[in-house]
């Protein structure tokens, strides 16, 4: 629909002077010259084209009329972490059938834990299906964002990279350094301006090499898992042939290291896994459901440790949508149970790990944690414990002392000669962003978020109007399905943009008191004598137990900045319907009339005598009640 703009209303539409209303004002009252649904243009900038950015590309044009949308992605392709991470064994660590949008139903996943390139390819299919490349700008990195208070606009500085003509952007040759004789990519910067800014990049984006002495002296092949790019082909399997006779080191014991060890151990000459901490490994989530869901025998279910789907099973998913929907619903229902908190599960996990490490009891002693299940991220890790038991695989628990030119020396005096080292040593999860976001009063978000981030429901920050976040601080879950939270968080930002457009608002900003109260809900706040630790969420949870976790900035103790304070279903309910009274507003128009957005008393179809004036009878708008209302139907309905 045409936009109403920001212009003042012609004097002819203003009320006559000298006719004060009942409140005793001076009688000046302004009506808008636009229809109530003649929505003004609104510009939205999204940073990142992973799951959140792709969803924003679908929902903003779907829900917001007259929207101008741009999605800036610094990488050369879409998919976020699934485009950038190509390390050996990269895969989804939850059933892939649950790792897709609620309105998309990919039925031909090759495995329950699908490889990363398959997830990225699916996201590309979604982008193509909804024609989102018209909004997405690849190789465009946001380097600065500043809120302008007088106009209520975000000024976003963008660095555009143009690849050199001598090498394609995704050649897979090397680690981002120019090759000999290759021209460096050309860069230029420009500024874009928007009414609404949505950050959609999450915390797990900036990887870091470990601070180990001698790292630069190592003469072999060295990669951080997040920085690795295949040299041969588009996936890591293309490099297996040249790695086959190599001695490989893998540093780490988190979910990434577990996948790398599992993938490489069967294919290399020797492998050493350097492990500093302990970790729980659960049986693959779906193993106990395979028999019922796929109709396999018990023996077949136990034999398929990687949970690869058989061709006939994939074909049934494709040909029988009802069957696929039932399987997906069963998986997600089971994942959303908070069962990992129960002590009997801890006993079951311990028993399972001890059985698989029966021939390596010294590994079980070092690897099995003393802290509760879910204190750290729980991973199924299919094949990892089996890999540790192979004769050519070494489990090294002695701390690393230094790199040498040819390998790694540990504190116990042992040195292993290595040809290839993968550092699965994590990311900078401090939420100190790589670029400045400047809000009201010139406050930098990085400064505001020291020593740790504070938000409102993980989606916005006081002092930063018209800015929303998907996968912001305290948005991830320790157990359950993540995608419903992501969808609801993006939907929250869309609802806020719709409110701004409909009510002609210049700014919408969460109150500082609301941020403070969410902070109190999660943790005891320093200086708050009236809030005891036992009255906040995290001090009573398993996540506060002593274990090193990225939830707590990689520390054993400290504030939890990664997790939502509740279940994933709790997060969905909290974000589903915004509590607008927790916000403050500024109007876009100078008139004092707070109901200026009502316009001239007409709708656009009436005003133009065009279009459908009985649209409310169309099927998509009719809210049909069920034939027989059940007494407790409200418990099930998404109200």
Where are these regions (language model features)?
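C-terminal, flexible cofactor-proximal segment of oxidoreductases
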Residues: 3, 7-15, 280-283, 316, ...
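Beta1-alpha1 glycine-rich phosphate/pyrophosphate-binding loop at the start
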Residues: 3-18, 39-42, 46, 51-136, ...
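Rossmann-like dinucleotide-binding core of oxidoreductases
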Residues: 34-41, 45-46, 51, 55-68, ...
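Short FAD-binding loop at a beta-strand-to-alpha-helix junction that anchors the flavin cofactor
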Residues: 101, 221, 390, 458-478
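Feature captures the FAD/FMN-dependent oxidoreductase FAD-binding
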Residues: 110-204
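A conserved short coil-to-beta-strand element within the FAD-binding core of flavoproteins
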Residues: 138-155, 393-411
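Core beta-strand elements of the Rossmann-like FAD/NAD(P) dinucleotide-binding domain
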Residues: 182-196, 243-244, 411-420
């Amino acid at each position: 629909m045409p936009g109403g703009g920001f212009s003042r209303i012609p004097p002819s539409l203003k009320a006559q002077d000298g006719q004060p209303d009942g409140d005793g004002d001076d009688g000046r009252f302004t009506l808008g010259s636009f229809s109530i649904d003649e929505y003004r243009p609104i510009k939205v900038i999204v940073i990142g084209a992973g799951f959140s950015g792709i969803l924003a590309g679908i929902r903003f044009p779907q829900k917001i009329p007259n929207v101008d949308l741009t999605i800036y992605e610094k990488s050369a392709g879409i998919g976020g972490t699934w485009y950038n991470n190509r390390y050996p064994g990269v895969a989804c660590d939850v059933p892939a059938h649950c790792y897709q949008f609620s309105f998309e139903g990919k039925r031909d996943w090759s495995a329950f834990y699908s490889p990363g390139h398959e997830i990225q390819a699916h996201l590309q299919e979604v982008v193509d299906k909804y024609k989102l490349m018209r909004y997405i700008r690849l190789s465009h990195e946001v380097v600065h964002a500043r809120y302008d208070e007088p106009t209520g606009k975000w000024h976003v500085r963008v660095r555009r990279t143009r690849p050199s003509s001598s090498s394609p952007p995704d050649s897979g040759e090397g680690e981002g350094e120019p090759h000999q004789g290759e021209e460096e990519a050309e860069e230029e910067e420009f500024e874009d301006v928007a009414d609404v800014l949505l950050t959609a990049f999450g915390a797990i984006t900036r990887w870091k090499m470990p601070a180990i002495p001698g790292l630069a002296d190592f003469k072999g092949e060295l990669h951080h898992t997040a920085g690795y790019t295949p040299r041969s082909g588009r996936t890591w399997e293309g490099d297996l042939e040249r790695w086959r006779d190599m001695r490989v080191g893998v540093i780490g014991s988190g979910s990434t290291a577990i996948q790398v060890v599992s993938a490489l151990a069967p294919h290399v000459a020797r492998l050493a896994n350097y492990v500093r901490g302990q970790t729980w490994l659960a049986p693959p989530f779906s193993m106990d459901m395979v028999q019922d869901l796929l109709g396999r025998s018990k023996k077949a279910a136990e034999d398929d440790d990687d949970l690869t789907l058989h061709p006939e099973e994939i074909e049934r998913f494709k040909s029988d949508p009802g069957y696929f929907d039932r399987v997906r619903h069963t998986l997600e229902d089971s994942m959303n149970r908070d069962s990992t908190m129960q002590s009997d599960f801890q006993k079951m996990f311990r028993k399972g790990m001890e059985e698989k490490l029966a021939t390596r009891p010294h590994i079980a002693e070092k690897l099995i944690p003393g802290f509760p299940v879910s204190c750290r991220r729980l991973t199924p890790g299919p094949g990892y414990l089996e890999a540790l038991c192979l004769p050519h695989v070494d489990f090294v628990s002695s701390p690393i002392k230094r790199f040498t030119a040819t390998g790694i020396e540990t504190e116990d005096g042992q040195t292993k000669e290595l040809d290839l080292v993968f550092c699965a040593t994590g990311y900078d999860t401090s939420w100190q962003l790589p670029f400045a976001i400047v809000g009201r009063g010139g406050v930098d978000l990085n400064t505001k978020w020291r020593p740790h981030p504070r938000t409102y429901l993980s989606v916005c920050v006081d002092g930063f109007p018209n800015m929303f976040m998907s996968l912001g601080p305290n948005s991830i879950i320790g157990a359950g399905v993540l995608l419903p939270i992501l969808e609801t968080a993006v939907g929250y930002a869309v609802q806020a943009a719709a409110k701004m457009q409909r009510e002609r608002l210049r700014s919408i900003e969460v109150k500082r008191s609301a941020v403070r109260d969410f902070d109190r809900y999660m943790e005891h706040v320093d200086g708050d004598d009236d809030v005891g630790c036992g009255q906040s969420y995290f001090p009573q949870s398993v996540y506060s137990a002593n274990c090193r976790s990225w939830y707590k900035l990689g520390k054993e103790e400290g504030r939890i900045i990664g997790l939502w304070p509740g279940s994933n279903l709790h997060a969905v309910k909290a974000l589903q319907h915004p509590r607008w009274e927790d916000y403050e507003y500024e109007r876009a128009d100078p008139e004092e009339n707070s109901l200026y957005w009502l316009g001239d008393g007409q709708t656009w179809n009436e005003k133009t005598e065009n279009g459908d004036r009985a649209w409310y009878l169309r099927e998509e708008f009719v809210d049909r009640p069920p034939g027989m209302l059940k007494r407790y139907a409200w418990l099930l309905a998404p109200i």
